[in-house]
């Protein structure tokens, strides 16, 4: 199987022949594929779009395709395509150093944001050499699954019926008369029993049955088998799309991340995949969501604890406000959910992340819809400043725009355009501290603090 890496917004070009040597040509920003694999990938992606009605991962054009902002892994027979984010303006060569650093940064962002289905301990375990983002994510998922399963399997009470030698629960009179008229030592009962056959355990086992057939490093396959052995008493149930998700509560919420990842794996495999065949699957993440969740989680963990009295609310949690009110239905319309709200001492800062590349020609001017959105936040949350946060790009500087109201042009607040560097090694203490300082500066400015809190890199 040919394994290649391409960067977000990079090009996939159709080669002139079917030889695998074609893939040696180019860089992760401009990748040439053998013609047969290119055609197969295009057919697979186009049919997937038509069948599921989802947005395009690759924008197909004449003899080449342009990768969008979805990152992860696409596998078809003969090809595994890894898509990594483009985090800076560097022109990466074919060498593995740049690709490996980008891959590790993406893993850090996924783990921090919760999409990697692991907590902080997972970061230290992501040491698979030359592994794709798919292998690393699966390894992290299995570490988390094993951690939770060793604490205890998910269990719930289920109603069971049976012809028992002892009376248990409620006697079902109709069945008792029919079945046991001549067997007075038997009791047909309906009772509640504590069982490990729950939707969560079934979904975990379904996911591991799929993973055990994939080409994974042996250390990862060992973990898959460990999970399957723990779930040995859980029955094998075929996976069907559209089944309702379980209700998560305080008893089982620790499984929510691994359940979500299991659903992603199962829903990403091809509908016609068969045991023992080369599998077709996708495992993709929208970088806009990855960036949003990463920044929110990072700010909560690394910045807010250093600002006395500050509170952060991701996705407006606990403070979603409608922009309109319907007097007939007596309810709000169009609830606003800012990516991150930071409050302190009566002041409010709204942060909205955007995984976009602003144009140098327009001097870092946000799009009209983004400005309208931030103006609505200023108005509805009664704040003096709302900030758009983008990944850093060379030759672009921060800027402020005064929002106006009324004919007299009174100032309604300030919309800031700020940038953070996510191309530095985020997995290192220094990279972590650099990002924390940059975000602390932005938040302190938005809250009107005289100086940002000190952030030191661990020794």
Regions found by a protein language model. Give the residues of each.
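Residue(s) in the substrate-gating loop at a strand-loop-helix junction
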Residues: 2-281
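Catalytic core segments in nucleotide and nucleic-acid processing enzymes
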Residues: 1-46, 278-459
């Amino acid at each position: 199987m040919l394994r290649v890496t391409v960067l977000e917004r990079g090009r996939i070009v159709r080669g002139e022949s079917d030889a695998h040597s074609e893939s040696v040509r180019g860089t992760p920003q401009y990748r040439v594929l053998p013609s047969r694999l290119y055609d197969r990938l295009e057919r697979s992606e186009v049919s997937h779009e038509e069948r599921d009605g989802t947005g395009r991962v690759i924008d197909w054009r004449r003899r080449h395709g342009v990768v969008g902002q979805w990152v992860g892994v696409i596998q078809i027979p003969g090809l595994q395509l890894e898509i990594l984010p483009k985090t800076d303006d560097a022109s990466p060569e074919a060498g593995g150093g740049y690709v490996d650093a980008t891959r590790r940064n993406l893993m850090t962002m996924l783990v921090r944001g919760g999409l990697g289905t692991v907590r902080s301990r997972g970061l230290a375990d992501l040491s698979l050499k030359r592994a794709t983002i798919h292998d690393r994510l699966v390894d992290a998922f299995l570490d988390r699954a094993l951690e939770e399963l060793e604490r205890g399997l998910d269990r719930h009470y289920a109603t069971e019926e049976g012809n028992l030698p002892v009376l248990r629960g409620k006697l079902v009179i109709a069945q008792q008369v029919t079945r046991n008229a001549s067997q007075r030592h038997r009791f047909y009962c309906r009772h509640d029993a504590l069982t490990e056959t729950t939707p969560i355990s079934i979904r975990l086992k379904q996911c591991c049955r799929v993973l055990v057939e994939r080409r994974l490093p042996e250390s990862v396959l060992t973990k898959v088998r460990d999970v399957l052995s723990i779930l040995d008493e859980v029955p094998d149930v075929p996976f069907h799309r559209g089944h309702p998700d379980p209700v998560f509560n305080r008893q089982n919420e620790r499984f929510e991340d691994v359940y979500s990842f299991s659903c992603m794996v199962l829903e990403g495999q091809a509908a016609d995949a068969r045991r023992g065949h080369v599998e077709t699957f996708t495992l993709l993440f929208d970088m806009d969501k990855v960036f949003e969740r990463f920044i929110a989680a990072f700010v909560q963990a690394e910045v807010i604890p250093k600002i006395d009295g500050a509170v952060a609310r991701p996705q407006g949690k606990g403070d979603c406000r409608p922009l309109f009110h319907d007097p007939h239905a007596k309810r709000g319309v169009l609830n606003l959910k800012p990516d991150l709200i930071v409050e302190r001492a009566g002041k409010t800062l709204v942060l909205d992340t955007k995984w976009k590349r602003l144009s140098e020609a327009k001097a870092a001017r946000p799009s009209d819809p983004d400005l309208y959105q931030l103006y609505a936040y200023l108005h509805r949350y009664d704040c003096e400043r709302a900030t758009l946060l983008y990944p850093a790009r060379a030759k672009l500087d921060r800027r402020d725009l005064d929002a106006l109201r009324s004919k007299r042009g009174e100032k309604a607040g300030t919309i800031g355009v700020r940038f953070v560097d996510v191309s530095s090694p985020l997995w290192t203490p220094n990279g972590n501290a650099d990002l924390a300082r940059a975000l602390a500066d932005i938040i302190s400015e938005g809250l009107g603090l005289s100086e940002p809190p000190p952030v030191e890199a661990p020794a």
